[in-house]
Swiss-Prot record:
CDD domains: SerRS_core. Belongs to the class-II aminoacyl-tRNA synthetase family. Type-1 seryl-tRNA synthetase subfamily. L-serine binds at T238, A239, E240, E292, S392. Its main location: cytoplasm. It comes from the Bacteria. Consists of two distinct domains, a catalytic core and a N-terminal extension that is involved in tRNA binding. Keywords: Aminoacyl-tRNA synthetase, ATP-binding, Cytoplasm, Ligase, Nucleotide-binding, Protein biosynthesis. One of its GO terms (biological process) is seryl-tRNA aminoacylation. This is Serine--tRNA ligase. ATP binds at R269, S270, E271, E356, V357, S358, S359. It comes from Buchnera aphidicola subsp. Baizongia pistaciae (strain Bp).
Amino acid sequence: MLNPNLLRNHIEFVFKNLARRGFSLDVKQFTEMEKKRKILQTKVEELQSRHNTLSKHIGRIKLIHPNIQCMKERIITLKKKIDVMKKELKILLEQIHIFLMNIPNLPDINIPDGMGSDDNQEVSRWGIIKNYNFKIKNHVELGNHLNGFDWKSAANISGSRFFIMKGKIALLYRVLGQFMLDLHTNEHGYLETYVPCLVKTNNLYGTGQLPRFKTDLFYAKSLLDESQNNNNFALIPTAEVPLTNLFRDCILDEQQLPIMLVAKTPCFRSEALSYGRDTQGLIRTHQFDKVEIVQIVHPSDSMQKLEELTIHAERVLKLLKLPYRKTLLCTRDIGFSSSKTYDLEVWFPSQNVYREVSSCSNMLDFQARRIKARFHCNAQNKKIFIHTINGSGLAVGRTLAAILENYQQKDGRIKIPKILRNNYMNGLEFLE
C-alpha cells in the first residue's frame, strides 16, 4: 500500500508515476473522499470536545442550575450525533482503505518504460548455449522416454496442469529442492523456515495478491464451521506470502535487520490468465514446488540487498551450469507489489528461447504498510516501515525441465549436473 500522505500531498506525482505502469489513478474520487474525511473528522472532533467539556463541568453547572435535566439531554444528544458521525466516518475510512489497497506500487525511477515483456532490458547473459548434432527433444518427450512422467494418471486424479513423477526423475526433482535449500542456508546465510501452505486470506491482502488477483488463487472452506466465509482460506501461490506475514504487526529492533529467510513449499495457482498457454509439461502447472528467498531489510539498504538476493538466485543456475539471462523488467511488466524486478530466464533449447525461472523484486515499504511491519530506527528515534525483498531461488519444476533439455544426450539419456552427482544422486551420472 502506498503512503496515504504521499497521495494527499503529492497526488500529481503519484498519478504520473502510476501512469508509467499503465494504472490510471482516479484523482477525483480520492480527492472527494479525502475532502469528506476531513470534514467528518473535524466535526467529530468538535462535537467530542463539546461533549467532553459539558461532561467535565456538569458538577459545577449543577451548583448554578439545580435543574440540570436540559444539560443532560444536550450531552445525550451530542453523544448520539457523535456515534452517527463516527459510524459514517468508519464507513468512509473503509472505502478509502479499499481504494488504497487496489493501487499498485510506484515503479522505480531507474527501470525502463515499456508496454510489456518485449520492452524489458537485458542486463547480462551467462553460460554457453550448446550446439547439438542431433534432433533435440523437449522436456516432456525426454521425461516420457525415461518413464519418469505419468500425465494420464495426474489428469485422472486432479485434472489438467498437474503432474506425477516417478523413479529417478522424481529423485532428481526432490534433490534439486534440497540442493537449493542447502545452498541458500549454508552459503548465503538464510534461515530455513517451514511454513503452512494454507493461509487466511488476509495474508494475501498483506503481500498484494488480493484484492486484484483473486481469480489466480485456489480457495478452501472448512466444512466444520459453517460460519466461515467460502474464501476465508487459500492455498499459497508462493512462500512469499507466509514468510512476509511472519512480520505482521511486528516492531523489530534495528539490530535485527536484515532478516533472511528461505522456504521450499508447494505453490498453487489457477493460471486463469494463462488459458491455452504452456498446457503441457512443467512450465505452467497448478501445483509446483518453489524455493523462495525473502529478506526483511533497512530502507537505506533495500536496493543493494535486491542486487545481493538476485546474485543468490543466479548462483543456483551457475552451479547447475544452466545458460541464463538476467533482465530488468519494464514498468508495465513488474508485479503489482513490486517497484523493481529482475527476471532470471533459463535457456530452453527445444523452444530456442529463455524462460523465466526466477523473479527477484524489491517491494520497498509497500507490503510492510499493508501488514504494519516496522522497526525502531535509532537515528530518527521513531518507528518506520521495513522494506521487503523476495525472489525465487528457484522454481524447482522449471529448473528440472531446463536440466532435462540442456543435459540431454543423443541416445535419450540425461547427464546429471556435476554438482548434484555425488552429494545428492549417490554418484549417478546419467538418467536412463
